[in-house]
């Protein structure tokens, strides 16, 4: 890692340093709540075009950095670009979310073309390179992918929801789920590696639906694939930092921390950050976990929550973020208020912080 990269606050935290005030970026910080995003979305015509047209995707990625001075930019894309690049048909229905042509057996999986992944994701890599060239030197660029289980949920069910087909397949046809996850895991290693080569400082794995699984399947389909991705990325890119987000993982977050090798764990809004830091089997950075609905609501409670979360993890490596993505009708001024409040906080007395005993 270069000296310049080491000076970036987010990377300092991912390296195990407690930085005050904690650096901040927000999941879905580039999105429909911003009027400048809505203009570009209309110009693109459809969501896939927005993700795969590098000048537009670059501009969308940079918008929240310019407006709010975020400490990190996260690549603007979608977790379903990966199966789409493999050959699975994808469309985004207005008001209904993504629709994939379902994989309902091994024949459907075998119809995908891993050799097409590089060409299919080349626009993403161009976007990473363009963003890298335009970011302020202190701003971290985060690449990302969906974690294998979460991507498999969409590939098998074909749409969002509570994924009843995928959950049934886990029991009725475990070989199919294992094969889909194997395909996605292998592709994700390449996909994230190419993002790093294109200029990403670190990467994040979004396992938005990890909490659907019972403990034995969580180990098999969340922990094990994540550990493999982390291991292989570090073989190719020694020292690269990885953030994992096992959303709604509950107590399984502890073995996730122990066994995956991630450098930071994203916390959803159900997590008590101080309790997790005390129970964690090894020292990792934490990311989160302001409620997106409180961000939308604003008011006195918003400022109080910002300070409570930040103070609770003072002295521990922490990246301030949300517990899930920004909701579309969030007032941008509420985001600005969070940044202002966070950066106005003076360092406290560490011996009095919530983690003093850890």
From Swiss-Prot:
Chain segments annotated as transmembrane: none
InterPro entries to which the protein is assigned, alphabetical: UROD/MetE-like_sf (IPR038071), Uroporphyrinogen_deCO2ase_HemE (IPR006361), Uroporphyrinogen_deCOase (IPR000257)
Main EC class the enzyme belongs to: lyase
A Gene Ontology biological process term: protoporphyrinogen IX biosynthetic process from glutamate
EC number: 4.1.1.37
PROSITE patterns tied to this protein: UROD_1, UROD_2
Main location: cytoplasm
Source species: Acidiphilium cryptum (strain JF-5)
UniProt keyword terms in alphabetical order: Cytoplasm, Decarboxylase, Lyase, Porphyrin biosynthesis
GO MF assignments: uroporphyrinogen decarboxylase activity
Protein name (Swiss-Prot/TrEMBL): Uroporphyrinogen decarboxylase
Record-marked site positions (Transition state stabilizer): 78
Localization terms from the record: Cytoplasm
UniProt key word Transport: no
């Amino acid at each position: 890692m270069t000296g310049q990269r080491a000076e970036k606050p987010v990377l300092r935290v991912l390296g195990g340093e407690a930085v005050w005030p904690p650096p901040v970026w927000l999941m879905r910080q580039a999105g429909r709540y911003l009027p400048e995003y809505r203009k570009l979305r209309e110009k693109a015509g459809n969501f896939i075009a927005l993700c795969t047209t590098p000048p537009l995707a670059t501009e969308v990625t940079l918008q929240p950095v310019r407006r709010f001075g975020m400490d990190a930019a996260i690549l603007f894309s979608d977790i379903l670009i990966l199966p789409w690049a493999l050959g699975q048909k994808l469309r985004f229905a207005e008001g209904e979310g993504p629709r994939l042509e379902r994989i309902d057996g091994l024949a459907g999986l075998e119809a995908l073309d891993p050799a097409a992944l590089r060409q299919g994701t080349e626009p993403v890599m161009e976007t990473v390179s363009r963003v890298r060239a335009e970011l302020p030197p202190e701003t971290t660029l985060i690449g990302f992918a969906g974690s294998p289980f979460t991507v498999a949920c969409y590939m098998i069910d074909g749409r969002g929801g509570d994924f009843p087909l995928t959950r049934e397949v886990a029991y009725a046809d475990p070989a199919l789920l294992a094969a889909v996850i194997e395909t996605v895991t292998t592709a994700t290693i390449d996909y994230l590696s190419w993002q790093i080569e294109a200029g990403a400082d670190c990467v994040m794995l979004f396992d938005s639906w990890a909490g659907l699984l019972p403990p034995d399947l969580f180990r098999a389909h969340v922990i094990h694939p994540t550990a493999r991705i982390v291991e292989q990325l570090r073989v190719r890119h020694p020292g690269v930092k990885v953030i994992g987000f096992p959303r709604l993982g509950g107590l399984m977050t502890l073995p996730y921390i122990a066994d995956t090798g991630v450098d930071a764990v994203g916390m959803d809004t159900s997590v008590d950050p101080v309790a997790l830091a005390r129970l964690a089997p090894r020292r990792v950075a934490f990311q989160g976990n302001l409620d997106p609905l409180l961000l939308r609501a604003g008011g006195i409670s918003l400022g109080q929550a910002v300070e409570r979360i930040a103070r609770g993890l003072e002295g521990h490596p922490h990246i301030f973020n949300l517990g899930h993505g920004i909701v579309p009708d969030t007032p941008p001024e509420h985001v600005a208020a969070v940044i202002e409040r966070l950066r106005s906080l003076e360092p406290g007395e560490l011996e009095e912080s919530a983690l003093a005993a850890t």
